[in-house]
Amino acid sequence: MKNATLLLLLVMAFMDVHGQIPEPPKSMISPTASSLGLYGEIPVSHFTGIPSIQIPLYDLQVENFKLPLSLSYHAAGVRPDQHPGWVGLGWSLNVGGVISRVVNDMPDDYNNAAYSYGQNAGYYYNYAVLNKSDWNQRAYLRQVAQNLSRMIKDTEPDIFSFNFSGYTGKFILTHERKWEVQCDRPIKVEFNNKYLAVPFKKEGTEAQTYGYYPSFEGFTLTTEDGVQYVFGGNTNAIEYSLDFFLQYRDEWKATSWYLTKIIYTDGQQVIFSYDRGDFVNQMYLAVHHDLGSYTEASGGIFNPQPECSSWNVSSIEASYQGKLIAPVYLRNIVTSDINISFVREETRELRYDQRIYNYQRTLWSGSSVGYPFLGFLLTNIYEDNYPQCLEKLKWYKLSDIQIRNSNGDLMRGFHLLYNDISSQRLMLKSIIELGYGLKGRTYSFEYNKPEMLPPYLSNMVDHWGYYNAKSAPLNYANYYSYREANPASLQYGILEKIKYPTGGYTKFVFEPHDYRKQLSFNRWESCEELASNKIAGGLRIKKVINSSTGKVANDVISREYFYSTDYLLNKENAKKSSGILGGQIKYSFSDYVVSAFNDRDVKRKMSMFSSQSVLPCCENSMGNHVGYTEVIEKRGDNTFVRYLYTNFDNGHMDESADAVIQVSRTPYEPYTSKDIERGHLILQEDYTAGGILKKRKSVDYERSSNNFIRAMKAGYKNICPGTAVSYDEGTTYRIYMYNYRMVKETESLYDNSTNPVTASVQYVYDNNGLLKEITKDVNNGKKRVNYKRVDNYSTDVCKDMVDKHILSPVVEESESFVANGTTQLLKRSCYNYIPLKKVTDRLFAIESIKQGIASSPLKEKYICHSFDTKGNAVYITRGEMNIVYLWGYNYRYIVAEIKNATLADVEGIIGTIDEFSRAKEPDYGKLSLLRKMLDSAQVTSFTYQPFIGITSITNSQGQSVYYQYDPLLSLIHI
């Protein structure tokens, strides 16, 4: 999948040049062709075994940009303690975007002067602590850990992850207070240094005295084409959370900033609006036991040392924790022409059992806290009404999506149906598509025995959080075995079938993950092979089965998958898993020893137990705990493809932290991850059904840079309460921010598994990570294409474009043939851009294109003489031909192409171009007049049903082709 994304980017490099030159529609695909792919086309991430299941709903078109609206399903298995979102268990609504934050240490924006050391305590203000040449030396680490005023402040930057419009990545603050971005395309991150106050009441909390710290207002991310994406900006677009049981003491933290605005370079905008919903909660079970800790010292009677011991074991009931979340829900998306509204309703779905809250309620009742229990759920903080207050926790479901035009007419809609019963988790059952009041196509979904899933916090989950149908009592000797995966129960609740509007269906057959290798206790040291395969929690795809008729008799196994290293030898009997578990599971630590820094003779030995295993360290890549180095995809005709991926066992191990204070170590401590390097395709081999190799493709990669973020965890604690003898702990580590990008593809074609014909393609990138050069093997030589973009030139226009982060446009493109050390220029094209400030100060358009063959002088091939007030090209010369384009429907579509005419000729007949174009409906009478009066011109005209498609094309001879759509906006007749 990563390679597919990169190849898409290579194609887009050409679109940046030619997409601005107007081209009228040439044809439309047939209704049959437009319905292809309605079943069975389910791409799979072979490395993780997770199929990409997506239901496309609608594409919002804004000029040349498309904003897809879809639903996607994450088919990795069901974690029963994770609450479903508003479109049901496993499903996500894909539209707009979000920036989500992982808080490290304390929030980067933390600044509350009401607390001692709270002023400017977040990393955003404290970044300079890592702006030292010896930041990763143990001596400096200990200085920070032992200094109260330093260690009590944030030394570990938060991670901000983004996902919008096909862009995914993360950004983190550097030690120089700059935003460093990791993304496969160049993105600029801006924070406007503004903050927003928390929008929740302070009554009944310590905030009445101390207040809440304000959060980052939001961020603006600019993509390489200059389009700006604004996140946050108002509190209704920001989600917050705090500790569920310590609501009176904790402070609200901003966790997510939602996309509120897209600003295109021509000034058009897409506005996203949100509503603040009722509070919800995410609860979890977290048992932490002190199994016995004590000090050791040898000071003698003249130098008495602190002596203390501890032991603390609690029940399951005392170990429930959680977060109170203040969610937001997308209300609508608005453009100048379209309004998409999202309607939600309260659900009746399964809720957390009251027993989860009762223990903490009992503790509160016997305490003298002085603040109400669960105060944010109380209507009146002076009236305790537990447990009725739990009803203030309300979950919602998305019930309808309504797409309306600027007149308010319903163009298209989707009605979502769920099981929505109090005994089960919310699950999406069907999507009904509506159009102009008609009930139409239906997608429906079937799941594997969802009624078999346990209640929330059943204490019946495996090491990775998946259901295993086994209770896990706190018996330390046997606890590991209680948490082992159960293949049978892993299947409950997973999506099994999608029924499509065409009547066909796709069935999914899943199987548990397995692995043959795992990392050593110190994950950066080695990848160890086991004597046999072991089962892991979660699911991977085994088979995809299609039926075009919806009948079992027509079932066809489209694809079958084998995650093994010995398939070539043993075929379907292959047994040796290629899976690697990204870490070891450990719950008990019996020999963790720390030494005092201010008394060298004192040590503290600790034994600990934690029910939360080492999940933060048990990851391979792409958020999965198991990654597969080798995968076989067997197709319906018995041909098969062998895929090999980068993984721990072929050179992509993580690295240890730079410095660690204490000698004893646990898997909990930070490390330097290289997960960005894992999961990339390095070899693909295509075989016949008889096992004969027909094609081989290998892929090479490089790191885009050596960039990394500095990070530090540091602090100290007292050896014993009430003493000044203390021990320090700390780690410095790196967060790599480079991209792992493809630099070479080599493909070999085989006639009979021997004497292959081999060719390669090499890629070179510029300083912004955009494609600079492609070199292909051709005809005993190499064909090389070079791109020079705006940052290679110092003209005022190019500098202005770079300043506005418009980096992708190509200024010069050249093609050469290289053979025997000689380079021969084949073709050169130059693109000249001009600013269209009458539209916006961010819009630049191609004014002219010059081309030359070999070493001949450049000749003008295209020139745009005039643009309208929206930036559309209206009068051009291509070669020797003058062409006028008439735009209509408020500048949205080309309604006429007039060849062999000038703008003056056209405006002399119909009036000004802008007056014609701004009308909601074109004056086709004026087009008829043009056909009559411009005898030597060739006029081709187009009509449209706005936001649906083209309805007719009439050529210069007066011959017309008509297109008809059904009420659900699908093309049905030509």
Locations of the language-model features?
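Non-catalytic interaction/targeting regions
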Residues: 58-61, 78, 82, 88, ...
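Intrinsic-disorder-associated interaction segments
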Residues: 10, 92, 134-137, 141, ...
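Extracellular/periplasmic ectodomains of large secreted or surface enzymes and adhesion receptors
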Residues: 899-944
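Short, P/G- and charge-enriched loop/turn segments at secondary-structure junctions
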Residues: 41, 618, 927-930
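Bacterial Sec-dependent N-terminal signal peptides
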Residues: 1-22
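N-terminal-proximal low-complexity accessory segments that begin disordered
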Residues: 23-77
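Acidic, aromatic-enriched beta-alpha/helix-loop junctions
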Residues: 70-100
